[in-house]
Amino acid sequence: MADLEAVLADVSYLMAMEKSKATPAARASKKILLPEPSIRSVMQKYLEDRGEVTFEKIFSQKLGYLLFRDFCLNYLEEAKPLVEFYEEIKKYEKLETEEERVVRSREIFDSYIMKELLACSHPFSKNATEHVQGHLVKKQVPPDLFQPYIEEICQNLRGDVFQKFIESDKFTRFCQWKNVELNIHLTMNDFSVHRIIGRGGFGEVYGCRKADTGKMYAMKCLDKKRIKMKQGETLALNERIMLSLVSTGDCPFIVCMSYAFRTPDNLSFILDLMNGGDLHYHLSQHGVFSEADMRSYAAEIILGLEHMHNRFVVYRDLKPANILLDEHGHVRISDLGLACDFSKKKPHASVGTHGYMAPEVLQKGVAYDSSADWFSLGCMLFKLLRGHSPFRQHKTKDKHEIDRMTLTMAVELPDSFSPELRSLLEGLLQRDVNRRLGCLGRGAQEVKESPFFRSLDWQMVFLQKYPPPLIPPRGEVNAADAFDIGSFDEEDTKGIKLPDSDQELYRNFPLTISERWQQEVAETVFDTINAETDRLEARKKAKNKQLGHEEDYALGKDCIMHGYMSKMGNPFLTQWQRRYFYLFPNRLEWRGEGEAPQSLLTMEEIQSVEETQIKERKCLLLKIRGGKQFVLQCDSDPELVQWKKELRDAYREAQQLVQRVPKMKNKPRSPVVELSKVPLIQRGSANGL
């Protein structure tokens, strides 16, 4: 029966994988719902306050670029050729061979540069033209040949073109997507969890599918009780920090994190799914690798280490078991549990795996940095070639003996190693950090320039264009079955409790890596959801044409901000009422959807603007004179933050203004009133008073 269950789990998992690759959007079991277009009023202020409404910020985001591109290509004729030129350059930069670049560079020059020069309409500098011409004459076609044009294209786009984008519906759509992104609160219900694919000290790893996009991931679940039992709280939190540091920027050689979230019992990392097994497994199945095969793996691992070191992260646990293969056979560095940030303070702890640890790591009290990883790389490459670490002779398992040999033994390299390989390993395995390859001031570049890698084009390595030595078999789960992986004994943690103080440790654990979420959405459901939302909004506009749209009321007035919130202002009401709110310098107005009358609350009536919590949901509490309360609930975190800020600012400024104006005796206070007409307060005045 157990065998049958294992087979069914494998089949289900493999089917999910195949469908996810073909049509991930069709596999989405939940839909992303974009908020109303009116969210723009709140989100634009929220993003502006954080310096996010700039050309550089929006153009560098995947969804921002796609919407800006759509606007330029379809709605702004003068920007269309600039964006087309930009996209052709980006395609050129990804070409694999010099021959392809020679042909394509000439085509780009003729179509986008020479044509404009002949028409006397070339909007770029003479320096940019001469730069490209000079290289083409010499038949030099580096990937960054057109970089001067990239800079000038962006310069031309960041002025009037960007301003027109900000005023367009495409920026409204950007605000809608950013609101969704900034309000992500993941739970287990957001994933379909498949079979177990691995187990570690604190928990287990499963294959899973994200419900709203259909994308497949690995879910690493750490048991909070097991963490507490092993006093591993610092390690668990450190792994989340290290993953957040290395998971930004383009690096296909690290198992990166897209999300982190928590449940009452677990901490979960959502990671890149690697289906090809690890190098330790393949070493045991395949036998030792040739120099050429090892070179292929080494090159990709070096780029992974370079990405970490550029972010001041030292990995500290490089070994074949931590190098995972994807379905195509390319490798990624996994498991950052022992990684450390050395940007402010160098570590000195002796951590890692015996046989791969650098001498400075083994020596107590000695500080180190990325140097440790280059020594470990030398040990690992030796193992791929010989089947054992250079300091683990005769299969000894005595850790003290292995450490002693690491600190004292001069490594003897076999005569069968090529001179280039010997040079590389001798450089990496130097006990003296000041003489070690990778530690002489230029980091990974020193290793990449080793004669052993002379035959490689590092751009081709980065683009994963070289065929890998080993392609994992398709249609198989390259992991042990659930029975062999085993499970934890729940009796171990039966008596362990998790009081509030323990849960508080993980309060800031949840995280979404923005660029990875945007990439996931762009690859799966972006076009579908945009098309559906366009249809819904068009229908709603037609429906609201007679009554007028809620946003129209704010036009031409001194409205600070407007948008939907839910209110609970009447003591006899127990349900939330969704209303459209308008914040003015001296009052807050609201109305129901499709309703003409407004309700009004003046700033003079408000005593304070506070944050409260109702049924574990953050709300805004407006205390009103006479002991009354007015509670508001927002649909998303950014809305709550911005409404709280703007209400407090308006209230404070109104109070300051009142203090400057002489008080009138016996003036009655205005109650909360229903308005069927424009209020007597002059709406078009500078401050409404």
Curated annotation (Swiss-Prot):
Subcellular location(s) of the protein: Cytoplasm; Cell membrane; Postsynapse; Presynapse
Protein name: Beta-adrenergic receptor kinase 1
Leader peptide range in chain numbering: none
Domain AGC-kinase C-terminal: from-to ranges: 454-521
Binding site for ATP: 197-205, 220
Residue stretches making up the Protein kinase domain: 191-453
Membership in a protein family: Belongs to the protein kinase superfamily. AGC Ser/Thr protein kinase family. GPRK subfamily.
Domain PH: 558-652
Pfam families: PH (PF00169), Pkinase (PF00069), RGS (PF00615)
Annotated RGS domain residues: 54-175
Job description of the protein: Specifically phosphorylates the agonist-occupied form of the beta-adrenergic and closely related receptors, probably inducing a desensitization of them. Key regulator of LPAR1 signaling. Competes with RALA for binding to LPAR1 thus affecting the signaling properties of the receptor. Desensitizes LPAR1 and LPAR2 in a phosphorylation-independent manner. Positively regulates ciliary smoothened (SMO)-dependent Hedgehog (Hh) signaling pathway by facilitating the trafficking of SMO into the cilium and the stimulation of SMO activity.
Superkingdom in the source lineage: Eukaryota
